[in-house]
Amino acid sequence: MMLFSLFLISILHILLVKCQLDTNYEVSDETVSDNNKWAVLVAGSNGYPNYRHQADVCHAYHVLRSKGIKPEHIITMMYDDIAYNLMNPFPGKLFNDYNHKDWYEGVVIDYRGKNVNSKTFLKVLKGDKSAGGKVLKSGKNDDVFIYFTDHGAPGLIAFPDDELYAKEFMSTLKYLHSHKRYSKLVIYIEANESGSMFQQILPSNLSIYATTAANSTECSYSTFCGDPTITTCLADLYSYNWIVDSQTHHLTQRTLDQQYKEVKRETDLSHVQRYGDTRMGKLYVSEFQGSRDKSSSENDEPPMKPRHSIASRDIPLHTLHRQIMMTNNAEDKSFLMQILGLKLKRRDLIEDTMKLIVKVMNNEEIPNTKATIDQTLDCTESVYEQFKSKCFTLQQAPEVGGHFSTLYNYCADGYTAETINEAIIKICG
C-alpha cells in the first residue's frame, strides 16, 4: 500500500509539472500551417571578405522556406554586394560550403545597401512601416525567429555603417513583449563577444530564448576558409552548424535544447551560450522555423563537416593572403602586397593607440566600486562613440572590436565615461 501511494504521488507530481509547462508554452493548433510564424534574417556586413554572412542568410532563408515558413513571413536584410562582386569567381551565386551549392538564387531580399542599418532593423521588429519595406506584423499568438550574423564587440553588434548596442536592443525586445508583438521569440546571434548582448541583461520572463556563437569575451569563428577558387571563408561555424542541424532534421521532433546542445558540441572553437527563458528549450524548433517534415532531398549533396576554421577578426588579412597566393599576375600581386602592408601597419597603429590610452588610464585613480551592468553599458556606448569619432571604427577594421574589450572593462571597473573619453581625446585628438 505504501509503495502504491508513493507511485501515485510521483505520477501526480509529473502530471502537475507537465501541466505547468503546457500552461506556459502551449503548442499552437496553427503549427501545421505555419501561418503564425515569422522570421527576420540579417547579414549586418558588407565587403567581399564578409562573403560568409550573406551566404549564411541565404542558406537559412532556403531552409526556413523548405520547412514551411511563408515567404511573406520572412524578412531579409543583406547588403547584396557579394553575389555579383567582381571578386566573386561565380557571379550570381553564393556558396556556404565546399559543395558549391548555390543558395543565392530565389532569396527575396527586403532591405539592401544603405537600408541595412540598426535603425531600420529595430523598425522592422516593431512593425514600423516607416522602415520602407516589409516589417513584422506578428501578434500575441505568433512565434518569431530572429537570426543575425556579422561582427561584434562587448555590448554591441555591427551593421555596415553603424552599431546596435545591447541596451537599445533589449529595450526593443521589452517593447515587443509589452505590446504583445509575439507569443514566443527565439534569437540566434553570430558575432564576436555575442554573449554580451544578453549576459546579465536578458530577463527570463519575456518568453525569449537566445543562443549566441560565443560568450561575452571571445571571438566567434568562420569556416570553409580554404576553397581552391574562392579566396575568403564561405560560412560561420556556429551559423553553419545550426542551419545544417535544421536542414537535416524533422523539426517537429527536434527541441530547441537538442539543437543548442548539438550546435554547442559541433562549434568547438568558441563557447556557444544560451540565455533568457531556458524553459523554452523543451519546445520544438518547428514552432519557430517551420513544421514541414522535410529534410535534405536524397538528390542533395549531404552537408559537409566544417573545416579550415579561422577567428573571424583574422578573415580580412586571411583573404588578402589568399588573393596574393592565388594570383599569377605580377602587377596584381605587387598591388595586393602593398595593400597587405598598409593593413598590417593599420593593425599595428590600432594596437599602439590602445596601448597609449591604457598608459593614460594607468595614471587615473582606481575606482572604489564596480559599475552595475546598466552603468557599464551606458558608459561603453559613450566611450565607443568617442573612440569611433576620434580614432578608428569597427567597420574600418574588425580588430578594433578586439580592443573594445579594454574600454568595456574600464567601464565595468567603475571608471566614468568622461575619464575614459578624455584619455581617448588625449591620444587621438
UniProtKB/Swiss-Prot annotation:
Signal peptide positions (record): 1-19
Keywords: Hydrolase, Protease, Signal, Thiol protease
Entry keyword annotation includes Phosphoprotein: no
Enzyme Commission designation: 3.4.22.34
Hydrolase in keyword set: yes
Region: Disordered, residue numbers: 288-309
InterPro entries in UniProt: AE, Legum_prodom, Legumain_prodom_sf, Peptidase_C13
Reactions accelerated catalytically: Hydrolysis of proteins and small molecule substrates at -Asn-|-Xaa- bonds
Gene Ontology biological process terms from the UniProt entry: proteolysis involved in protein catabolic process; vacuolar protein processing
Family matches, as Gene3D superfamilies: 1.10.132.130, 3.40.50.1460
Enzyme class: hydrolase
Pfam families: Legum_prodom, Peptidase_C13
Active site: residue positions: H151
Proregion residues excised on maturation: 20-31, 292-429
One example GO MF annotation: cysteine-type endopeptidase activity
GO cellular component terms listed in the entry, alphabetical order: vacuole
Family named by the database record: Belongs to the peptidase C13 family.
Record function comment: This protease is used by the parasite for degradation of the host globin.
The protein's name: Hemoglobinase
Organism listed in the record: Schistosoma mansoni
